[in-house]
């Protein structure tokens, strides 16, 4: 599966939520035509990719090619199985999410114009992470921060997982981090989204 030109945008539905952004297959973007069960299909001709369980209980995937106004909807569906280990969604102003095969439900291809893509001006000079740390005893310390000993600039990323869904979030998009327990923390983003990551 591959785009003919440029990047491909989509909305991914998983067992834990819906994500919208630039789509990558199996941790890499496809940019050339690829054979699939002896059928050549460009990604920009695909409308949906959906997951279902095969006879052996494993997740497999089917494709529904894009329907043009002159097509007969009855002929629109082609059941082509395609192995997908994961789908990564690069979301502007949030970060990237990697959805595993087990938690993937559906991908819908959308026009890239529906995304608010970042421009060169959205990437200023690197800034140190600044903030406040509140201890369990109530003490507050303010200044430059180094998260996990080595992340000290806003362009560096916080890596976390929830089940088998992986997140990579630049610190510039994070508002606060609060411990939930010894395994997970609550992450609040600047757009007010909240995540529980371990």
Annotate the PLM regions.
Residues 1-198:
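Compositionally biased alpha-helical segments
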